[in-house]
Amino acid sequence: MSAEQEGRIRVTEYLNLDIERERWMCNRCGREIGPARENYKKGCLLYDRDPREIHPPLVSGEFNFSPDPLWVRIVEIYCPGCGTQIETEYLPPGHPITHDIEFDLDNLKERLRKGEFVIRAQRLEAAE
């Protein structure tokens, strides 16, 4: 692991948190996505998909097992640097993008400083 990655923890498969700089980072290309005190999705590329493209009708007619775009939308969230798909959301039309990950950065930094937690191989662990 490079020295610049030492202060990062892996949050999801494709998303890292740089604790010292308080930035969201793409795990694949290292691109800064945005401030860690905000929703990381604000710095990503969003693709609002028609659910019928993803789940094509299985049978003809009104009841065809395909999601109705009047009831659901599919939003794909991509890294603006490398295009890796970070997340997918199924939302009601008009519903804002969810803010699903939020850390208490001040508390986390304090606990790291005190030695209660350590970062090993991009994982946050309790100190021994």
Model-derived segments and spans:
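Phosphate-end processing signature that detects enzymes handling 5′-triphosphorylated RNA
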Residues: 77-78, 110
